[in-house]
Amino acid sequence: MAPYSLLVTRLQKALGVRQYHVASVLCQRAKVAMSHFEPSEYIRYDLLEKNINIVRKRLNRPLTLSEKIVYGHLDDPANQEIERGKTYLRLRPDRVAMQDATAQMAMLQFISSGLPKVAVPSTIHCDHLIEAQVGGEKDLRRAKDINQEVYNFLATAGAKYGVGFWRPGSGIIHQIILENYAYPGVLLIGTDSHTPNGGGLGGICIGVGGADAVDVMAGIPWELKCPKVIGVKLTGSLSGWTSPKDVILKVAGILTVKGGTGAIVEYHGPGVDSISCTGMATICNMGAEIGATTSVFPYNHRMKKYLSKTGRTDIANLAEEFKDHLVPDPGCQYDQVIEINLNELKPHINGPFTPDLAHPVADVGTVAEKEGWPLDIRVGLIGSCTNSSYEDMGRSAAVAKQALAHGLKCKSQFTITPGSEQIRATIERDGYAQILRDVGGIVLANACGPCIGQWDRKDIKKGEKNTIVTSYNRNFTGRNDANPETHAFVTSPEIVTALAIAGTLKFNPETDFLTGKDGKKFKLEAPDADELPRSDFDPGQDTYQHPPKDSSGQRVDVSPTSQRLQLLEPFDKWDGKDLEDLQILIKVKGKCTTDHISAAGPWLKFRGHLDNISNNLLIGAINIENGKANSVRNAVTQEFGPVPDTARYYKKHGIRWVVIGDENYGEGSSREHAALEPRHLGGRAIITKSFARIHETNLKKQGLLPLTFADPSDYNKIHPVDKLTIQGLKDFAPGKPLKCVIKHPNGTQETILLNHTFNETQIEWFRAGSALNRMKELQQ
């Protein structure tokens, strides 16, 4: 094995990198640590300023905030070609964050790279594997017992390779990042689609797949297609029942689930100052639901206040010094502008089954009656990475306190998920948690829980039609409880609390009355609560594991008989030929999210074992041939069976296959398993009308061909019984379409064109069999 420095030098030479950037290089003008946990890793505002000035001089125009932060992290700002929506940028992120469900595969890939240490500050957060059953402490103990093997792997891998480890119970990754790691101007990538949460603190924080994280941890420049910038101008101010959540619910209704694809959403305008820092994080977090690359707010006094309250006054002071680089230039141009008057914005509730179906709360009851949606609310759930801040808990408690004063409790079941151990300890100290319990709530563990399907729900049977209301971010079919008949709606935590007390979608807290225990009618007043605790946060229990300075003796063991973890085998290289006679595994009808492609919930336990988790491949996708989920025709036997079984049959018999998809294929989570699984089971290409950004990149990273119909109507020319040949791979080049020959069973053929977004580097991934294979080639 070559020394680490030599490996890095070889990689950089092969990739054309001029200088190896490490975040710990000392600042010229100031030395402020990126976090309390990494005292020798410094914020590089001086480098950000230098790069911004180089790019501004080249482009000769005012820059948006998004451009400042992104271009400020260019690997080669003097020579990088920059064109929004077209060129690929080579960037140097400041840090990497991984949650436990995706960190398993990311760390397995990093181990395969052969590198001894991560090159940038990185952390692992245990939040996804804790199932909600009865309550916080018992659920946490159960999760530690069930997931001991995985937690031990992540802890020892973190110690071995220099990655900080947040133990189970510490909280949700995005809340931990906001409290400890995000700062104005940071470029952070995370292996979770809601990483944009950090935009609430003025950073560009982007969700990626594990293979992208491996690149950054290996010290390789990270590639991102130069994003467009959508400006959202906020005027007026929030008041009454209207909350930050309503801003993004409104934006989702305007832009839809794919309207932000390929763009950063940048909020600006005088209305920004009426929103708390954690409220801005809520808005940025749910920007993932419109397909945005990320979202961001400009640095302001709210962020300064939050930094100071979370023990980072030194960062706030440094940000003040560089403030001009942390806000947009006057006169900067956006690719699209949306204007929202916060004075006129009403409380919203979105759903069911998609986060962009927006309704004012005042109207949803009427719409539900018309559509036949269940009006009675079975469960109200507050928390999640989107809405679990101190302010969120305080506003919900303010609503609950009014109900208690009139002798009322929740008519619906009611659960509360604190965002972090710090939030849990602080709301316990300040009495909010007890108020929420008194109104009928159950406080769950500091984890994702029901939001990602980690919910052992007992009150209904699968297939039973029912309604739940959450303060979460996603409400895809079956996501929360694996029941396709659960009508899930997303709204603010205070609206969830009010609706859980009333027990019906027909209740409008702005106008409707409740009847107290004494028989008297009363109206809930709009909640008011502190955005931050008046005294310091209570940190609660210490849940962080520092990586040791010397890890030379650290072992990382993966049992060959484990059902949870599996070392990776390299994927096969491209054989240099066109892809002939591909069988169609499934032609997908309609929406196909990463939840449909690789379900979460009970499958999370297999996230570190590629072969086992591949048994959930596309089990949620609807087959256009019969309108059913997880039922496809085996082209050899002509029998219908589960998608994974059919894929395994094809792999065993040497039959290569393809998936045909609809619009925005792969929207939702960043989980790269949705790309690893089809590759592992013999897939070669995914052909759709359009892709979600993260999933398209993940497919490329694993050596698959994500292709789009040059004419979207060609989707209708392909039938599940056809065979496809993809031609032109010997001359595969950026911007050059590939040909697809459709071979029908009756002997006729049609030829169509397929577009792609591959650049030269990504084409090398395909030829090598995967991005990881290519990395290994460059080490030799």
Swiss-Prot record:
Residue numbers carrying N6-succinyllysine: 31, 50, 138, 144, 233, 411, 517, 523, 549, 573, 577, 591, 605, 628, 689, 723, 730
Record-listed E.C. numbers: 4.2.1.3
Gene Ontology BP terms: citrate metabolic process; tricarboxylic acid cycle
Cofactor: [4Fe-4S] cluster
Region Disordered, residue ranges: 524-560
GO molecular function: 4 iron, 4 sulfur cluster binding; aconitate hydratase activity; iron ion binding
Pathway the protein contributes to: Carbohydrate metabolism; tricarboxylic acid cycle; isocitrate from oxaloacetate: step 2/2
Family that this chain belongs to: Belongs to the aconitase/IPM isomerase family.
Protein name listed in UniProt: Aconitate hydratase, mitochondrial
Lineage: Eukaryota, Metazoa, Chordata, Craniata, Vertebrata
